[in-house]
Amino acid sequence: MDGWTLPQPVKINNFSNLNQYNEFCISGDGGIMVMSLETSAGKGLLDLYVSFLQADGSYSTPKNFGSAINTAGNEMTPFLAADGKTIYFSSNGFPGYGNQDIFMAKRLDNSWTNWTEPLNLGSEVNTPEWDVYYSIDAKGEIAYFSSSKTNGTNLDIFSIKLPPQAKPEDVLWLKGVVSDRITSLPINADLTIKTISEPINFGFTNSSISSGYALILQQFGSYQIQISADGYYVNDTVITIDSLIGFDEIIKNFSLIPRKEGLIIEMKNILFKVNSSVLEDSSFQEIDKIVRFMKSTFSDTPHFLFQPI
């Protein structure tokens, strides 16, 4: 079918499930998978677990969310918001309105076991019946969920505007296309993003010829974005987000230089402070960019000529 790739198997290390049911939710960048499973080491019946994408493309051994979230009952139908911190799930292990109620909680650190107290989303969502599969849009404005409240048996889909207390943290969508710098035509490329303050992989996505790319930034600050594609030199750039106030979108297009002999690659000026031999702060970023460029290309393109223009 046009617009879809062929299905690929997903490997989760040491995966096991004693229940006939399981549910999964993957973050927008594919780096985090939240799931509902029943295991012999769990807190009760179905528990919530988290797994992280590994370098080999598999997901890590599932880690239990801990007793702040998981009870002796069933915790199921998890949904991780775009902020990567707010989790929505259904449970029959907490006091509530009926059979299976919908709750939300926020992650307090990177342990994935330290959470705020689960908040019941109230009678506008929860009923004496089965209320499950709560999900929200990236803006954090509209929620969708399933409920059997109409007839007590079959599930219907409902939507509701999120109340302030149920909203996730603000995020920013970074969107755009990657193109060939010579032809200006869009190309398929990979984008990896890291925070400058904590140089670990923050997100990964693909840019396609037809739809471009989209990345979610969950906090303000400086980010290093590396764009790569077969047959092209790596583009390494830094962007800075001063603040996040509500949901926002930024369009940022990138271009890659094709690997062709004789091409001239222009670098920005390396500047010094006035009447000083000390480099301007902005110059260090450009020097680092040149070093990363040379490291990424030197192995298969050993000959460079640098000269002022």
What do the PLM-derived regions correspond to, one by one?
Residues 190-194, 226, 305-307:
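Beta-strand signatures of extracellular beta-sandwich domains
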Residues 206-212:
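Short, solvent-exposed loop/turn segments in extracellular or other extracytoplasmic domains
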Residues 219-231:
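A short, solvent-exposed beta-strand micro-motif common in secreted/extracellular proteins
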Residues 277-285:
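Soluble non-cytosolic domains of exported or imported proteins
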